[in-house]
């Protein structure tokens, strides 16, 4: 695993797990509920949304926690985490772009989707590094 990939997986893992965990506590829990309501997403997806962020964070951290995993298993886990993160960030961008969602309930109070785009970029960069690693292993 390259140095950049190590940093990216640790960073994304810690961020996503922390973001998901904090959404269970006020005031962030209330903000997350408002985001869902004002963007017309199904109310039933609030809990799965919170849990899925924690799961993605755990998946990014799993190669660090289970050193006994094979390289192939680590690559598959990281690509799965990147794919789920991609979907989550597209939803987050959608939420940021909804006119009814006020800036004060969004991360850092920023209405433009700067945060989800930055996290999406890091996820794509991680997936690219994993893909390069897979290609190098095949050669």
Residue map of PLM features:
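Membrane-interface extramembranous regions
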Residues: 1-139
